[in-house]
């Protein structure tokens, strides 16, 4: 079996303000763009090989992927299933709010107009199942979001609710996953 890489997008305006982005588009900061360029440079210099970059269509991930692609020459395309979870009424609220933290414990809750953890898991697990089938002949870099990173990690590792909630990937961190 093969492998793939996961990269979280660069820093956004709302990351800097400690707000929940979710499915709301929050643009990269200048620092976030610099992080993406540094990641592209590191991928190139490390000799990491990939056939294609798949990215969330939200601008923070799309811009990160396109910067990495321009530096590495790896082609890229949008993959809608990598869109961050829609946190409904919690979008743009403080990330460390205790009400939001409590709401996240309800995996089947849609956050009043959003998407449940179970719905998110279905689309991410289905995508990873497809990538696994192709992994012997094709290596991907997925550029997405921290909520997606949690789901990817849970695909490979059993996690308690607390471990799941606390798991995170830093902006522009590269993580390798082996099937």
Feature locations, PLM:
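Active-site-proximal alpha-helix that buttresses catalytic centers in soluble enzyme cores
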Residues: 2, 7, 11-74, 115
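Catalytic metal-binding/acid-base residues of hydrolase active sites
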Residues: 11, 59, 82-83, 147
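Short aromatic-enriched loop/helix-cap "lid" or pocket-rim segments at secondary-structure transitions
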Residues: 16-19, 65, 88-92, 155
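Alpha-helical elements of Rossmann-like donor-binding domains used by nucleotide-donor carbohydrate transfer enzymes
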Residues: 38, 42, 63, 67, ...
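Short beta-strand scaffold positions
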Residues: 55-56, 122, 143-144
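Phosphate-handling substructures
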Residues: 70-125
């Amino acid at each position: 079996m093969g492998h793939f890489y996961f990269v979280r997008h660069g820093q956004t305006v709302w990351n800097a303000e400690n707000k929940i982005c979710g499915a709301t588009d929050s643009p990269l900061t200048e620092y976030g763009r610099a992080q993406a360029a540094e990641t592209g440079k590191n991928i190139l210099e490390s000799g990491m090989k990939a056939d294609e970059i798949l990215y969330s269509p939200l601008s923070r991930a799309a811009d990160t992927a396109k910067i990495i692609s321009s530096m590495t020459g790896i082609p890229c395309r949008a993959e809608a299933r990598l869109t961050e979870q829609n946190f409904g009424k919690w979008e743009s609220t403080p990330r460390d709010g205790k009400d939001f933290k409590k709401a996240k414990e309800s995996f089947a809750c849609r956050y009043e107009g959003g998407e449940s953890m179970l719905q998110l898991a279905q689309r991410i697990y289905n995508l990873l199942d497809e990538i696994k089938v192709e992994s012997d002949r094709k290596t991907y870099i997925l550029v997405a979001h921290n909520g997606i990173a949690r789901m990817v990690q849970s695909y490979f590792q059993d996690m308690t609710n607390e471990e799941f909630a606390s798991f995170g990937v830093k902006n522009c961190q590269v993580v390798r996953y082996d099937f």
